[in-house]
């Protein structure tokens, strides 16, 4: 009695489409509009070749001394994303700092978290870099990003300038 061997085919699952492809890879009027709006900012056409769109969530603010240095640092982050083959997009979110917010920044932590979550969720972002530097801003950004469940990198750095009494 001969045994027949059944061929078992293992089908490879295709990698899921990136979130950003739901905006930029479309071949309809909406895809055209999304690409056109982005190209209006000077983004070249080759950025839409399927590379990951990486959001830079920036808490830069002149009202928050521990986040005031992120304006310049964001440019280096953008260059790094480009060198790694990504498409960087920077967006602002609420910045919290105890120095000027009254009565306390803690009252706004959850609001900042919601700002981050909805900004990431609503836009064509495949991963995000969080730029934060205060004890209220850092947890709020991390909480918001965790709610969206995308690859996330945190740059937490505070730079407070000192002065001398003359």
Feature-to-residue mapping (PLM):
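N-terminal amphipathic/basic leader segments beginning at the initiator methionine
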Residues: 2-51
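Glycine-rich phosphate/diphosphate-binding loop of Rossmann-like nucleotide-binding domains
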Residues: 50, 54-55, 61-95
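Glycine-rich oxoanion-binding loops at beta->alpha junctions
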Residues: 33-42, 82, 87-130
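A glycine- and small-aliphatic-rich helix-loop capping segment at beta-alpha/alpha-beta transitions
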Residues: 72-76, 107, 111, 143-154
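Residue-level detector of conserved catalytic or cofactor/ligand-binding positions
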Residues: 160-166
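A short, small-residue-rich loop immediately preceding and capping a beta-strand
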Residues: 120-141, 152-156
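Short, ordered loop/turn segments at secondary-structure junctions
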Residues: 59-61, 93-96, 133-136, 156-160
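Gly-rich Lys/Arg/Thr-decorated short loops/hinges at beta-loop-alpha junctions or inter-strand turns
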Residues: 15-24, 54-61, 91-103, 120
């Amino acid at each position: 009695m001969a045994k027949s061997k059944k061929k078992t085919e293992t089908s490879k699952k295709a990698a899921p489409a990136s979130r950003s492809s739901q905006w930029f890879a479309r071949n309809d009027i909406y895809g055209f509009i999304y690409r056109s709006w982005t190209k209006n900012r000077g983004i070249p056409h080759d950025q839409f070749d399927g590379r990951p769109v990486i959001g830079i969530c920036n808490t830069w603010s002149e009202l928050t001394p521990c986040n005031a240095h992120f304006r310049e640092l964001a440019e280096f982050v953008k260059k790094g994303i480009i060198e790694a083959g990504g498409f960087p997009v920077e967006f602002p979110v609420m910045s919290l700092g105890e120095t000027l917010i009254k009565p306390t920044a803690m009252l706004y932590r959850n609001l900042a978290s919601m700002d981050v979550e909805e900004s990431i969720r609503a836009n064509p972002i495949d991963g995000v870099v969080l730029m934060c530097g205060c004890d209220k801003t850092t947890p709020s950004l991390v909480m918001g990003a965790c709610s969206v469940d995308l690859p996330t990198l945190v740059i937490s750095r505070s730079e407070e300038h000192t002065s001398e009494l003359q």
